[in-house]
C-alpha cells in the first residue's frame, strides 16, 4: 500500500487504489442533471461578491458585477464529503439560500420552481486541479492534493447564465462515467 503522512496525526498505510465514494453515470442530459439526487448539500457560507477578472470570465459577465456566492459541501450517504462546491447565482435569486440542503433537489430545479427559470442549455467542463489549504482541511485531504474540478453553467431561455457551480472533488471520491453510442 501507499503511505500517507499528515502533520500532527502520524502516518497511515492506504490502498494503492483509492476508494470511490460516488459514481455518476452519464447517458443522457437527465442523468447529468440528477447529480444531486443521491447526495446531501450542506451550506457553509453565502455572500454577495463583486466579480474580479477571473470570476467575470467564468460567469460570462462584466467585471465588478454582483453575484451571490454560496459555499457548500456535498456528502454521499453521510460519508466523507465528496466535493466542495461554490454556487453562483444572480442577486435577485438570493432567496434560493433558504431552500438549499433540505433534500436532494438539484439547485437549478429549485431556482426553476422559485423564479420560473428553465434550464435551456447546460455546459460542463472538467479539468485537474489541486485543493487549497482552507478546503483541504474541510475535505480531509492534504493541501495541494489532486482534485477533479467540474464547472457547470446553466443558461435560461434567453441564453442568460442563471447559475454556475464549481465543484472540486478530491482524488478517489468521485467517478464520472459516460457511455456513448453512434446513432
What do these predicted ranges mean?
Residues 73-74, 154:
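Hydrophobic beta-strand positions
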Residues 60-64, 79-80, 90-93, 97-101, ...:
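C-terminal regulatory/effector modules of DNA-binding transcriptional regulators
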Residues 1-66, 95-120, 175-183:
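HTH-adjacent hinge/linker in prokaryotic transcriptional regulators
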Residues 50, 75, 88-91:
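Short, catalytically relevant binding-site loops at active-site mouths
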Residues 9-11, 85, 161, 165:
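A general secondary-structure boundary signal
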Residues 41, 69-70, 81-87, 167-169:
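A short glycine-rich, His/Asp/Glu-containing loop-to-beta-strand
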Residues 12, 69, 88, 149:
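Conserved beta-strand segments that form the floor/walls of ligand-binding pockets within enzyme
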